[in-house]
Amino acid sequence: KVISEELPRLKKCFNKKVMANVSGFSIDEYAYTCEKLDSQEQVGWLEVNVSCPNVHGGGMSFGTDPKAAAQVTKAVKAVTKKPVIIKLSPNVTDIVSIAKACEDAGADGISLINTLLGMRIDLRTKKPVIANTMGGFSGSAIFPVALRMVYQVSSAVNIPVVGMGGVSSAEDVIEMMLAGATAVEIGAANLVDPFICKKIVEALPTAADKYNINELKDIIGGAHNG
């Protein structure tokens, strides 16, 4: 339906290139999906979400193992000419080693972070609120964690880093860029305000002036200097 319905609908509404987010439960499934999307002119980039469980690897997320993440990267790069951005999970002990493994495997960029693992318990039933016990925790509360990981990864790789995780203001975008992000994605905030992206774009010039920034591109990684 993405190819037959969603892409035509998006083209009619925006007529812009889109980034397709790809998930999979096996390396073959990732490769199959990316190969199908490779022929779609409207898809400008592929963002490969390696936070999915590897059904052939004991259920462990591809994104928690440098070797598995690299295998997915290589498989996808073999079937597409489009830029491939690997989206990393924060639920790891060493996100830098995973980012570097993806870079070595041919990734064109790294995006981070996906949701943090969290849970809640219903005090009436004394049971987890989520049927699967744990689930993805997102929103502004995870911004400091995302910022830290963007800072760490951008220091270690030589490919573009896309920052995300709790971004909800022009100031957050500027912080992400100072941490090393060359681009910024917005997720959960769209569910609160569907117009948040437009508002942030419109607010950026004023925020840049406030903090004496002439060109946003000039501040990328600025927090690393000195």
Region annotations inferred by a language model:
Residues 9, 75, 203, 207:
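Solvent-exposed, charged/polar functional surfaces in cytosolic regulatory/catalytic domains
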